[in-house]
A protein has these predicted regions:
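Cys/His-rich, Zn2+-coordinating zinc-finger modules
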Residues: 7-17, 21-26, 33, 49-95
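Canonical RING-type zinc finger of E3 ubiquitin-protein ligases
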Residues: 35-44
Length: 95
C-alpha cells in the first residue's frame, strides 16, 4: 500500500471525488450473493459500496477494474482516508 499522507500528494484524480449516496449499508455485491466481508470501501465517483481486499471477494477492487472509478474512501467508523487505485496512494483530505 502507498504512503499515508495528510495532503493528497501524488493523486491526480481528486476531480473525480464526488458527494455520493452509498449504494447499500454493506457490500452490495456480498449482500447479493450471501457472502461476508471484513471492511467496507465507498466509491467516491458513483457510491458503490464494496468490500476491502482483505475480504474474500474484494468487490471494491473488482468495481474499480470494471468501472475505472479510481477513488474509494474507507467506510469504517472513525476512518477518513482515501485510496487512489491508479496512483496507488492513500491520503486524507485536509479541512
Amino acid at each position: 500500500m502507498g504512503a499515508m499522507v495528510a495532503e493528497p500528494v501524488g493523486c491526480s484524480h481528486l476531480d473525480q471525488i464526488h458527494d455520493v449516496t452509498p449504494s447499500a449499508e454493506g457490500c452490495e455485491d456480498c449482500l447479493r450473493i450471501g457472502a461476508w466481508w471484513v471492511h467496507l470501501r465507498l466509491c467516491r465517483v458513483c457510491g458503490h459500496m464494496g468490500c476491502c481486499d482483505q475480504s474474500p471477494n474484494r468487490h471494491a477492487t473488482k468495481h474499480f477494474h470494471a468501472s475505472g472509478h479510481p477513488i474509494v474512501q474507507s467506510a469504517e467508523q472513525g476512518e477518513d482516508w482515501y485510496w487512489c487505485y491508479l496512483d496507488e496512494v492513500a491520503f486524507e483530505l485536509a479541512g
